């Protein structure tokens, strides 16, 4: 158990630092590409390029980790991310920005499937939700604190935060190489179901009708809603309250603290007490209500409270869904978790685009649609999560039911 904690601590550090670079880009990207004479539509294409590459390559990396092990894929993902940050900061032409973002989408998508599969290899089913929560906390720390760091260091130069992110990512490789053992023994590699062909035509559609289909749909819905929220949050608060980058950055940092605390400390105990299915249902309801409350906020502190309420639900929802997906298979966990990341990437493609279109029509529409999406997931969970492929299922009343894998 002590070894597992040490290994997961290394993964926490690695994922947090790797995702920090992604977060750093959020507040800087619009200003950075503007210096190249690019328009808002170019910004949208640039963001979509990153998300599309993640969507396509996440299952490929998950499958490769089933074939060759978790450690080499982790190293490749983190080092590749460092290189992409450096290239982005050194870019002098618009095409170089697109190349750097495309490469970042490809290589950064290797980190999370391999890290989550590592946790799945190293933990029991009872401990897995807690382990996934710790990884999600690392994800939250990196992505949420990144915008604050990016905004603060952008005063030096718009390219400086990218150099900083590259240096930190390169540093994160050291503990992986020096202290993280491989979690997947050679005899378990390349088992049936671990082909490395990645996304075949219709594979994602077929997965929706498989044993984890509804869980993959939930992964898409929560990613769609959250990235829609994030995509227009700065625009929404600027238009409604006149908030500038510093105040928005402060809100995002507070969101990160809440998210990391919830995922790192409460996910495991709550899942053991009530089970993932109950956590998912409660979290979907909290997120739906949070979207609506956001529309009612009038003061800065009310904005903080309503955003915090929404983030609590989201922080519990992500690891619960991921944990159920990892429990759906005892062999091809990397592939299943790669599909999970692919559906989340698909949500990241459409979420900001739809939110931006809705925002142009009415600034309240993105949050109303976000609430509706969460309610659709909630109602669906009452019908389809009963068939989740678990050894033991726990409902919200605390009683347990036997299931199958």
Question: Predicted segment positions?
Answer:
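C-terminal transmembrane helical hairpin of 12-TM major facilitator-type secondary transporters
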Residues: 277-321
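Cytoplasmic helix-loop-helix junction between adjacent transmembrane helices
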Residues: 100-141
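Helix-loop-helix hairpin linking two adjacent transmembrane segments in secondary transporters
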Residues: 135-178
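Helix-to-loop junctions at the C-terminal end of transmembrane segments
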Residues: 58-68, 262-276, 359
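Short amphipathic helix-loop junctions that connect adjacent transmembrane helices
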Residues: 27-40, 232-247
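Conserved MFS/SLC helix-loop-helix module at the cytosolic interface between two early adjacent transmembrane helices
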Residues: 55-92
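Helix-breaking motifs and short loop linkers at transmembrane-helix boundaries and internal kinks
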Residues: 37, 69, 90-96, 107, ...
């Amino acid at each position: 158990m002590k070894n597992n904690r040490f290994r997961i601590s290394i993964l926490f550090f690695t994922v947090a630092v790797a995702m920090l670079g992604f977060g750093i880009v959020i507040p800087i990207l619009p200003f950075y590409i503007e210096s190249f004479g690019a328009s808002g539509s170019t910004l949208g294409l640039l963001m979509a390029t990153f998300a599309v590459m993640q969507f396509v390559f996440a299952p490929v990396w998950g499958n490769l980790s089933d074939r060759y092990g978790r450690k080499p894929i982790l190293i490749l993902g983190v080092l590749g991310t460092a290189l992409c940050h450096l290239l982005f900061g050194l870019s002098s032409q618009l095409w170089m920005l697109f190349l750097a973002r495309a490469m970042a989408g490809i290589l950064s998508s290797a980190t999370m499937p391999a890290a989550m599969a590592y946790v799945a290899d190293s933990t029991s089913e009872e401990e897995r939700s807690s382990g996934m929560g710790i990884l999600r906390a690392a994800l939250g720390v990196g992505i949420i604190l990144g915008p604050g760091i990016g905004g603060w260091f952008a005063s030096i130069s718009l390219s400086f935060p990218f150099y900083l992110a590259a240096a930190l990512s390169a540093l994160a490789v050291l503990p992986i190489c020096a202290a993280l053992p491989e979690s997947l023994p050679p005899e378990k590699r390349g088992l049936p179901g671990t082909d490395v062909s990645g996304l075949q035509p219709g594979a994602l559609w077929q997965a929706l009708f498989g044993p984890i289909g509804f869980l993959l749909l939930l992964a898409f819905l929560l990613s769609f809603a959250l990235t829609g929220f994030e995509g227009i949050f700065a625009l929404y608060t600027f238009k409604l309250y006149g908030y500038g980058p510093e105040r928005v950055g402060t809100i995002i940092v507070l969101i990160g603290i809440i998210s990391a605390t919830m995922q790192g400390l409460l996910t495991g105990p709550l899942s053991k007490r009530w089970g993932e299915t109950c956590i998912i249902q409660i979290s979907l309801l909290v997120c739906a209500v949070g979207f609506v409350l956001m529309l009612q906020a009038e003061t800065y502190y009310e904005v903080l409270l309503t955003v915090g309420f929404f983030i609590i639900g989201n922080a519990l929802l992500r690891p619960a869904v991921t944990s159920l997906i990892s429990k759906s298979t005892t062999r091809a966990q990397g592939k299943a978790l790669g599909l999970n990341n692919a559906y989340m990437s698909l949500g990241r493609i459409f979420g900001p685009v739809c939110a931006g279109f809705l925002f142009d029509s009415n600034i309240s529409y993105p949050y109303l649609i976000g609430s509706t999406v969460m309610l659709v997931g909630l109602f669906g969970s009452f019908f389809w999560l009963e068939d989740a492929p678990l050894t033991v299922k726990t409902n919200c009343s605390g009683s347990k039911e036997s299931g199958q894998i």
